[in-house]
Amino acid sequence: MSLVSGARDMGFDDNNNNKNNKDGDDENSSSRTRADDDALSRQMSESSLCATEEEEDDDSKLQLGPQYTIKEHLEKDKDDESLRKWKEQLLGSVDVTNIGETLDPEVRIDSLAIISPGRPDIVLLVPENGNPKGMWFTLKEGSKYNLKFTFHVNNNIVSGLRYTNTVWKTGVKVDRAKEMLGTFSPQLEPYNHVMPEETTPSGMFARGSYSARTKFLDDDNKCYLEINYSFDIRKEWPAL
């Protein structure tokens, strides 16, 4: 559900180490540090830089029904009043005469934004090739934030639009998240979806550069956007 999960989920929690070490001598402290390093390595050793096809497409085995145009959706089960009202509510003010015959939906991700209390929103425009150059953004360790997606849907209803995000640090996969965004009908106005609040990890193991892959897919496992990018976590936010 996030760009990068909290410290405990990723094995980057320094606070417990500090509490355990405060009464120990230097030798015990070094031993515990080495043990923590080994534990972190074991925790992440089974992950690789490239996620497997099974991990990336673990929903691909779902057996889905036939796809319909919007006009066909409206005609189907038209005698069922509850279904008819639900479809009308879902479609809203869609001009069926213009797009009702198009089978495949089109989803365009316009931008991603990182919203953090007391900070201006970090608005990330998506390059056409889906691969931002250099470091795409910087996060402060231990900071709370929400992700916000702005996107357009055209042509037809998109069912089960979802977001996946995989994160690597020094070539080792440290996090993978999925979030169901929902089902959306085509409309002229953009959709905005805000993710639940998350907290960036903190501590010296958490700071540094990361690489990540974000995807937006639907129930048919059709990928509308894949973004491969880099970001980093620092002690402080970059200067405005």
Curated annotation (Swiss-Prot):
Subunit description: Interacts with RAC-like GTP binding proteins ARAC5/ROP4 and ARAC3/ROP6.
Listed GO MF terms: GTPase activator activity; Rho GDP-dissociation inhibitor activity
TM annotation in the entry: none
Keyword Lipoprotein: no
GO CC, one annotated term: cytoplasm
Family: Belongs to the Rho GDI family.
Keyword rRNA processing part of the UniProt annotation: no
Major place of residence: cytoplasm
Entry protein name: Rho GDP-dissociation inhibitor 1
Region (Disordered) residue spans: 1-66
GO biological process: cell tip growth; Rho protein signal transduction; root epidermal cell differentiation
Protein role: Regulates the GDP/GTP exchange reaction of the Rho proteins by inhibiting the dissociation of GDP from them, and the subsequent binding of GTP to them.
Organism (species): Arabidopsis thaliana (Mouse-ear cress)
Places the protein is found: Cytoplasm
Lineage: Eukaryota, Viridiplantae, Streptophyta, Embryophyta, Tracheophyta
InterPro entries according to UniProt: Ig_E-set (IPR014756), Rho_GDI (IPR000406), RhoGDI_dom_sf (IPR024792)
Annotated keywords: Cytoplasm, GTPase activation
Superkingdom of the source species: Eukaryota
